[in-house]
């Protein structure tokens, strides 16, 4: 079975797809965002598109406590969507998680151009999962 090239897929879906969100920016300029699951930066572009690229990276909050899911797509299983995703759950502290994401994305030559975006998404998600500490109890100093 022959696969369709990513450039052709992008040319077909770039102007009209269900994930496209168009908003007006400053003045009259239009800003386009994307709600794709495999898009790290949510920017509507070929580089970040999860539809057009064979290799994609996704970082999401897990359902359970303080965990983050790092998902990458396998290039060999493109015709079987359920089997094409490789998920790993990260439960460690932030420095170890960031090292694991960097190793997975960059050091394995998977998508080194997405390192900065992946670490930014990981940072935002881990900040959102962090539980705020309760303040120190105020003592009554009147004696």
UniProtKB/Swiss-Prot annotation:
Q: Name one GO molecular function term.
A: mRNA binding
Q: What happens biologically when this protein's gene is inactivated, per the record?
A: Pale green leaves and slightly longer early appearing leaves. Delayed leaf growth and abnormal leaf patterning, with the abaxial mesophyll features appearing in the adaxial mesophyll domain. More proximal vein branching in the petiole and reduced number of small veins at later leaf developmental stages. Abnormal inflorescences terminating early and producing several secondary inflorescences. Double mutant ae5-1 as2-101 exhibits an increased number of lotus- and needle-like leaves. The double mutant ae5 as1/2 produces severe abaxialized leaves.
Signal peptide residues are none
Tissue expression: Expressed in seedlings, roots, stems, leaves, inflorescences and siliques.
By its UniProt entry, which InterPro entries does this protein fall under? Ribosomal_eL28, Ribosomal_eL28/Mak16
A cellular component term, taken from the record's GO annotations: nucleolus
Q: Which Pfam families match?
A: Ribosomal_L28e
Q: Which GO terms describe its biological process?
A: adaxial/abaxial pattern specification; leaf morphogenesis; translation
Oligomer and partners: Component of the large ribosomal subunit.
**Protein name as catalogued:** Large ribosomal subunit protein eL28z
UniProt organism field = Arabidopsis thaliana
């Amino acid at each position: 079975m022959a696969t369709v090239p990513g450039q052709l897929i992008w040319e077909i879906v770039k102007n009209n797809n269900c994930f496209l969100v168009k908003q007006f920016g400053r003045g009259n300029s239009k800003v386009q965002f994307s709600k794709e699951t495999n898009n790290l930066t949510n920017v509507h572009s070929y580089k970040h598109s999860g539809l057009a690229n064979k290799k994609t990276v996704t970082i999401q909050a897990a359902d359970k406590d303080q965990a983050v899911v790092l998902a990458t797509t396998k290039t060999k299983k493109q015709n079987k969507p359920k089997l094409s995703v490789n998920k790993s759950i990260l439960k460690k502290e932030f420095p170890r998680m960031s090292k694991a994401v960097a190793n997975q994305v960059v050091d394995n030559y998977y998508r080194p151009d997405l390192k900065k975006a992946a670490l930014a998404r990981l940072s935002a998600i881990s900040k959102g999962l962090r539980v705020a500490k309760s303040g120190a109890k105020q003592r009554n100093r009147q004696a």
